[in-house]
A protein has these predicted regions:
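Amphipathic alpha-helical interaction segments
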Residues: 12-13, 54, 85, 121
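Short structured motifs
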Residues: 53-58, 101
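Exposed beta-sheet edge and beta->alpha loop/turn motif
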Residues: 62-124
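Short coil-to-beta-strand transition motifs
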Residues: 47-52, 96-99
Length: 124
């Protein structure tokens, strides 16, 4: 997970998501976020602060029936600020931490652990 977090934060800082894409599948929320970041930077925008840290809250668990792995994680973040090239600003603050803990679902493919989905405990 540490390699992905480094690639994730590098993407946010630079707009170069090529490394982060290796760790997610195209149908994930994370993939859509990276496409947004790429377009933001390509059009002259940028991100301020906005970096994440993830803390493992469980061991990696293999679900034999679904043939996928899952791990409970906590996203640690404070603020996100995205500045569009036209001057528009999107600000988010982590004022409600009740949704910071969830599960990443993984597969192992082509030498990488790939995030294939994220779900809250009640969605598993």
């Amino acid at each position: 997970m540490e390699d992905w977090v480094n690639a994730h934060n590098y993407a946010i800082q630079t707009g170069d998501c090529s490394y982060a894409f290796k760790y997610v599948t195209e149908d994930t929320e994370e993939y859509g976020f990276y496409k947004y970041i790429e377009i933001l930077y390509k059009n002259g925008g940028w991100a301020v602060d906005s970096l994440d840290s993830y803390q493992s809250e469980s061991a990696l668990f293999y679900d034999e029936s679904k043939k996928i792995y899952r791990m409970k994680v906590r996203r640690i973040w404070s603020t996100e600020i995205y500045i569009e090239s036209n001057g528009g600003i999107t600000r988010k603050a982590n004022t409600d931490t009740s949704d910071d803990t969830f599960y990443f679902l993984y597969t192992y493919s082509n030498g990488y652990w790939k995030i294939i989905d994220s779900k809250y405990e009640n969605e598993l």
